[in-house]
């Protein structure tokens, strides 16, 4: 109990600190727009998108730890995750060498990030709703599921703005997100828990990919030099 309390206090401090500086990637909190649409520089948009992705990844890691603790309290240890069926079927790989980084385009980076972001929007909404029905779900876990759902939707809006700014109108044909309902439906209580855990378990991995790809995009657009993941 003491360990859980300390963990929750630390998490609240970190999340609140990050939230204090991160709104939506497309907000203009420091400008008096007087009813006119504000204009944010590309550098600022990329900076906010990276910050958003970092926050989302951080919350996903925390959520996984909190879910692990909840499973232990339920007497469940080493819950098996079948990544082939529960994780994103559209694999977006992170470049593994300097040669690969040089070969990929900014369009590929934007498209890959958008695919990952859009894929997880509905599953995260479903997990948020599902956790509300748990009898003993920690409030910290429920709160983080809501925050993940909100932030991933905000990040999608920011990515769409970045696509228009970097590639221009029509520069990337944006398809609707893949229907993931068949991947995450279950009426069995244990399978529901497994499904919810699988979503968080898999999402934190893709959240790290999103963060990595956005950092690379920001470097290529703004810094221009020494853009490497190594």
Curated annotation (Swiss-Prot):
Gene Ontology cellular component annotations, sorted alphabetically: extracellular space
Keyword Secreted in annotation: yes
Listed transmembrane segments: none
Broad class of the protein's primary localization: secreted
InterPro entries with a match to the protein in the record: 4_helix_cytokine-like_core, Somatotropin/Prolactin, Somatotropin_CS
Residues listed as glycosylation sites in the UniProt record: 226
Gene Ontology process terms (BP): animal organ development; growth hormone receptor signaling pathway; positive regulation of growth; positive regulation of receptor signaling pathway via JAK-STAT; response to nutrient levels
Disulfide bonds: 28-38, 87-202, 219-227
Any one GO molecular function term: growth hormone activity
Highest taxon, organism lineage: Eukaryota
Keywords: Disulfide bond, Glycoprotein, Hormone, Secreted, Signal
Signal peptide from the UniProt entry: 1-23
Gene3D superfamilies recorded: 1.20.1250.10
Cellular compartment(s): Secreted
Entry-linked CDD domains: somatolactin (cd10286)
A Pfam family of this chain: Hormone_1
The family this protein is said to belong to: Belongs to the somatotropin/prolactin family.
Name of the protein this chain belongs to: Somatolactin
